[in-house]
């Protein structure tokens, strides 16, 4: 497979205390702790699968930035696409007007999407796409004579975004508590973490059980009050939790029975992360809506989308009804142009097929870590895996909250110091997440495993008293 073209060489800045101090003084980072003595790394450059900090140190990016940089860093053609579009039409809104890049990208996404999902509403990112999907569901049912259908069901520990609506769908109490009262109408069902499933030994049977909890929740809330079910193909929070065989087939049956919309939240999973352009195709189901972002542009410019079926669009297509919703930068022409160029790379280099061919090798390489006592479970799909850390492999005993916080903080720092950028996830039992750029292959897999092995071996000695 062709490798990426290396960008023109540039000298890295000298270590700068002033730069780090400015970061501390002015920049309010996302999901980060701030305070005396806390310094955050400054990343200045990327090349292929490698990132560089302001001191010249390199790191293998095993998280694709934040599940974003599918095609790797330093893609000159994406920068060139942005520059060309900025020089032609740097901005125009989609508020009753269209632009050529938005038209073309919408057509492209409709071609990739399954079934009759042909209507594309652009946003600036993933959370906005989730907000859009919920609002579409609410208005759709009002327009079709079922105004009471407003609630949404999602899974325990699932993350769907941080704005007030998306946060109501998110299943993480710690993220929700500071911002209560939230938008009402979000309800939770169990997720599909088979490793932590009580009293289940058969994977398919467990999948049926988990899906049936959705039917149970719809019945409990009242079928005439539930508008949609939001599910990720592989659940991010909690550590790359895959769906058991038959799970989504059963969920589709349940949604059809109760006239509830199925939203496939693919903000992470779309665009090759699991394999196909849309992960619902890998798992064999057709949703009513797809939410996506991240890999759509490989992060070279912000963009998200909600893709809806023709059936959902129909009541909005009467010449009178308006979907009174939009974003200033949704479908920005520069971002849309970058998205088109990014998808050109996908097709030219066969990245989806590359992931499908190499995912078994990534899984097998990570599964070598099972010989470490601290590794309890390794799960995921495509180029999206989680490694759950435990006190005891045999009993699956996990760590206390205090232990988990110290453990993951130390593991994250040690991995980064060793030259590996990935993620430690404490939104559930402790997990290390691995999601490398889609151009990665066995050499990168081996480096990831080697560094993980070294750090987790040391961590096991400290926390398991070996």
Curated annotation (Swiss-Prot):
One of its GO terms (biological process) is biotin biosynthetic process. PROSITE patterns: AA_TRANSFER_CLASS_3. Its cofactor is pyridoxal 5'-phosphate. It comes from the Bacteria. It is an enzyme of class 2 (transferase). Was identified as a novel immunogenic protein with the potential to reduce the severity of M.bovis infection when used alone as a subunit vaccine. The modification N6-(pyridoxal phosphate)lysine is found at residue 294. Belongs to the class-III pyridoxal-phosphate-dependent aminotransferase family. This is Probable aminotransferase Rv3329. It comes from Mycobacterium tuberculosis (strain ATCC 25618 / H37Rv).
